[in-house]
Amino acid sequence: METRITKLLGSKYPMIQGGMAWIAESTLASAVSNAGAVGLIAGGSAPIDYLREQIRTCKEKTQNPFGVNIMLMSPNADDLAQLVIDEKVPIVTTGAGNPGKYMEAWKNAGIKVIPVVPSVALAKRMEDRK
C-alpha cells in the first residue's frame, strides 16, 4: 500500500503505533515496524541511558523505520531531544508541549517530525518550520 504517509515515513502501511508510557518499548516498537507500520518507543520521562538502550535494541531488532515519542513537558525533554539526534532516530513524535525550539535541529539531523499539537494555529506554525 502506497500513500503519502508511507512514502514520507518509509513504512509499508500508513499506521503509527502510539508511544504509550511503560508499554511502548523496543520489543513492541520493533515488532510493529517489522510488521510494516511505524513502531514508537515512549520517551516520556525515561532516564537517558534507558532510552538510549531501548533505541539501540530496537535498531538491532529491525531495519525498518521506527521512532521515539517525546513528551515535551518532561523535565529532561532537552536531553531526550538531543539523544534522538545522537542516536539517529528516523522519526520523532511529540506531545504535551510546543516542539518549536527543537524543530530546526531535528530537521537538520534528517529526522521526520510529527508534532501532536492542540490547535490548528500551532500546527500551521510547525508546518512552516519544515
Regions found by a protein language model. Name each.
Residues M1-K130:
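Active-site entrance/lid segments in N-terminal catalytic domains of soluble metabolic enzymes
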